[in-house]
């Protein structure tokens, strides 16, 4: 997916090569200390929580669809969401304006990467939702990241986020 993970900048492909190499490195280090990849993952879940991610693609065809998508992004910028699944939104990153705004303090910091029509909302409980129009298809994509103590709670939070996002459409 276009919202992938890159370990460094030495390989231009997201996800495939670098994430596989990172996973193999974790497994090798775990084995060297008498542990396993699985045990290390459980430790990370205990320390950092469990995350569940989901992609929602909303198709809006034709000229009117493109206008609807543009209006959705405009509304998200001009009337920011205050809560997601009952959690307070505490930070909004706007990659079109290159500004990250802390909603608790009002502090703004510069985002130092190329501009893009992307908004990311972060809550006080570690949930995040990113919105961006597709550059190649007539759709807007919402990337959901839910943090919880266990898998069932994370899945429930993703389902609740989906319901919240349907209200925005």
Regions found by a protein language model. Give the residues of each.
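Phosphate-binding and adjacent anionic-ligand microenvironments
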Residues: 1-132, 139-143, 150-156, 162-169
């Amino acid at each position: 997916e276009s919202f992938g993970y890159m370990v460094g900048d030495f390989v231009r492909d997201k996800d495939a090569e670098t994430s596989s190499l990172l996973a193999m490195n974790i497994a090798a280090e775990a084995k060297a200390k008498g542990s396993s990849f699985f045990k290390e993952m459980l430790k990370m879940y205990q320390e950092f929580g469990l995350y569940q991610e989901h992609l929602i693609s909303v198709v809006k065809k034709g000229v009117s669809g493109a206008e609807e998508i543009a209006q959705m992004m405009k509304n998200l910028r001009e009337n920011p969401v205050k809560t997601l699944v009952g959690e307070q939104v505490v930070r909004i990153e706007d990659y079109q304006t290159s500004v990250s705004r802390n909603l608790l303090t009002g502090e703004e910091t510069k985002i130092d990467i190329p501009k893009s029509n992307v908004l990311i909302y972060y809550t006080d409980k570690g949930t995040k939702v990113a919105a961006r129009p597709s550059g190649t298809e007539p759709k807007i994509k919402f990337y959901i990241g839910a943090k919880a103590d266990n898998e069932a709670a994370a899945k429930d939070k993703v389902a609740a986020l989906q319901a919240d996002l349907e209200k925005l459409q």
